[in-house]
């Protein structure tokens, strides 16, 4: 390290904006994220939030004060809004989707780890979701709950405040009961007892038919709906270049 290098400690203790004048033109400056106008709705990002330039926000998406949306994250309002509260961290490659009739609502001070998938669910304040966790339609995690690495909170499951779903386990029911992955038969039985089934619930497909026919019907409906739903999407102009010293 030479005398002109800046250490991480110095960055962390330097008031925002004071380093920019010492940098070559263009250093530490980025364009805004990819934002898409969808069905007359455009994303809303609080001025104090940070959204990485490679993140994608589509439609009725709101990001609260002090929240950070990291690289590769996708926040898509596909008929229902996506709301991210204040002080949240949505990490790399997370996918957050709001649908009809299930919006996605995330409270304050929530951490969603890399590759998490959250669809049409409610995540209360101060919840922790480890990398690869999945939360399905209509599910609810109470305040200060947690889902471990690769855990699944199934469609319609309700996890109590401070409830913990261990890594790799599957939560089913209201109130939720967590099963280890080794109990596949118990998981299937529990799911059958909830009345929640993906194809009938999401796509209106009769569960009684053969699997092959079900998938053919499902994909025909899904591709048609998605194409129609997004045909009028409009890529918004990039935001003005912003200095990212504030991240430190």
What feature does the model see in each segment?
Residues 51-52, 153:
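Short, structured beta-strand/loop micro-motifs enriched in basic residues and often containing a Trp
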Residues 55, 73, 82, 90-96, ...:
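N-terminal leader/targeting segments and the first structural element of proteins
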Residues 52, 84-85, 106, 118:
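Hydrophobic residues on conserved beta-strands that form the core of alpha/beta folds
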Residues 51, 62, 69, 84-90:
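Well-ordered beta-strand segments characteristic of repetitive beta-sheet solenoids
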Residues 3-40, 78, 92-93, 99-106, ...:
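Glycine-rich hexapeptide-repeat left-handed beta-helix
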């Amino acid at each position: 390290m030479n005398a002109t290098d800046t250490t991480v400690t110095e960055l962390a203790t330097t008031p925002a904006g004071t380093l920019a004048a010492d940098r070559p033109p263009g250093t530490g400056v980025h364009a805004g994220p990819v934002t898409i106008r969808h069905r007359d709705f455009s994303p809303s990002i609080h001025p104090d939030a940070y959204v990485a330039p490679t993140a994608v926000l589509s439609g009725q998406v709101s990001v609260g004060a002090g929240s950070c949306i990291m690289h590769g994250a996708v926040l898509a309002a596909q008929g229902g809004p996506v709301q991210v509260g204040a002080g949240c961290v949505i990490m790399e490659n997370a996918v957050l989707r709001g649908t009809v009739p299930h919006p996605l609502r995330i409270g304050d001070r929530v951490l969603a780890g890399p590759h998490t998938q959250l669809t049409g669910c409610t995540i209360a304040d101060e919840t922790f979701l480890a990398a690869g966790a999945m939360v399905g339609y209509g599910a609810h995690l109470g305040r200060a709950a947690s889902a471990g690495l690769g855990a699944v909170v199934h469609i319609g499951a309700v996890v109590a405040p401070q409830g913990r779903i261990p890594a790799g386990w599957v939560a089913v029911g209201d109130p939720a009961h967590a099963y280890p992955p080794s109990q596949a038969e118990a998981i299937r039985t529990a799911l059958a007892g909830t009345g929640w089934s993906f194809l009938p619930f999401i796509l209106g497909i009769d569960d009684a038919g053969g699997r092959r026919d079900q998938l053919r019907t499902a994909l025909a409906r899904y591709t048609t709906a998605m194409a129609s739903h997004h045909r009028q999407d409009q890529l918004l102009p990039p935001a003005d270049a912003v200095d990212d010293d504030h991240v430190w």
